[in-house]
Structures are given as C-alpha cells and as structure tokens.
Swiss-Prot record:
Organism: Conus parius
Role played: Alpha-conotoxins act on postsynaptic membranes, they bind to the nicotinic acetylcholine receptors (nAChR) and thus inhibit them. This toxin inhibits both adult and fetal (alpha-1/beta-1/epsilon/delta and alpha-1/beta-1/gamma/delta subunits) mammalian muscle nicotinic acetylcholine receptors (nAChR). In vivo, it causes paralysis and death in mice and fish.
Stated name of the protein: Alpha-conotoxin PrXA
Prodomain positions: 24-51
Leader sequence residues: 1-23
Subcellular location: Secreted
Record GO terms (molecular function): acetylcholine receptor inhibitor activity; ion channel regulator activity; toxin activity
4-hydroxyproline: residues carrying this PTM: 61, 75, 79
Transmembrane parts of this sequence: none
Amino acid sequence: MQTAYWVMVMMMVMWITAPLSEGGKPKLIIRGLVPNDLTPQRILRSLISGRTYGIYDAKPPFSCAGLRGGCVLPPNLRPKFKEGR
C-alpha cells in the first residue's frame, strides 16, 4: 500500500514538473490542473453529500443557499445524534 502511495505521489510530481522543464510558468501549470467550474460551493456540496455525489454532479440532494442561509439537508441525510450527551 505504501509503495502504491509513493508511486502516485511521484507521478503527480512528474506531471507538474514536466511542463516546468519545458518553460511553463508554475501559476499557469497549477491553474491548468484545476477544473474551471470548481467553486467553494461545489467543494462544500461534495464534502457534505459524502461519497454518494461528487463535485461534478449537476443536482446534489440538498440546496445550498450561500453562506448566510447555509445548507439544508433532507431528513435522510441529516446526522443522527444520540441523546443523553
């Protein structure tokens, strides 16, 4: 497992540094690795919805009303708390 991890790390390092050796600017290379439509709201949706829905899904199972309103989860996705604590 550790070997696979380090292989992936080295591949990512090579993926980023190879364009640098060809004269690319770091800011442009890193910007090219991130999707254009990635916004904080999409990241928040991805973190809240868990593994069922990803960043690129068109309609998450809840609505985000922005920072003031927060996110409203349907009852089946709300966390369940144990009483007594």
